[in-house]
Amino acid sequence: MKLILGSASPRRLELLAKLNINPSEVVSPNIDESIKSNELPLQYCKRIAHEKLKHFQNKYKDSVILTADTIAYTGRKLIDKTDDENIAYKNLLRLSGKRHRVSTSICIRNLENRIFKKTVTTVVSFKVLSSQDIEDYMKTNDWQGVAGSYKIQGMAESFIKSLNGSYSNVVGLPLFEVKNLLISAGYK
């Protein structure tokens, strides 16, 4: 049975490999990921994951399709992905000494065209970051293009005081839930 991973994230591919799942194809969905006016972070996350799936609606009929979207946020404020060093620095300052949430919405379409969805949230607490912590981290370039402007699987792991929930969710794909959704969808 074929699996299509609808994602540009190399981390999702690495995480699926931990489940011994190797997608037949990895395709980046080309969709507008702009946040809508008054859209809350979780609504946004669910909508984007579903729109990624809709992008493949009439393609890959002989395959199971998996899409996902991961966000970081504090309260109602999304901490978006960025390639701008100044914005990333400000994002890390905003996370310093505080709790935030990382949510991933998963959508799977099976061969019968049924859609399976799940959203997983992990609460992450950062230590108080010194300007030196942030400057050192910025040199790694791990902040580029990732939710919250940090990759937990790198140097940023040393910023984490506590984590309540799925570690792999913060990386980009909650493995427990993905495995169970794939089973429910009939993926073998």
Regions found by a protein language model. Name each.
Residues P23-S34:
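A short beta-strand-loop structural module common to alpha/beta enzyme folds
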Residues R12, E33-I35, I115:
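Flexible, glycine-rich phosphate/dinucleotide-binding loops
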Residues K2-I21:
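N-terminal beta1-alpha1 ligand-phosphate binding loop
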Residues M1, N22-S24, S63:
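A structural micro-motif
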Residues A8, P29, L111:
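Cofactor-binding loop segments of dinucleotide-utilizing enzymes, especially the Rossmann-like FAD-
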Residues L15-K18, K36, N58-K59:
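Short loop/helix-cap segments at secondary-structure boundaries that form the rim of catalytic
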Residues L3-I4, L40-K188:
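Anionic-ligand binding patches
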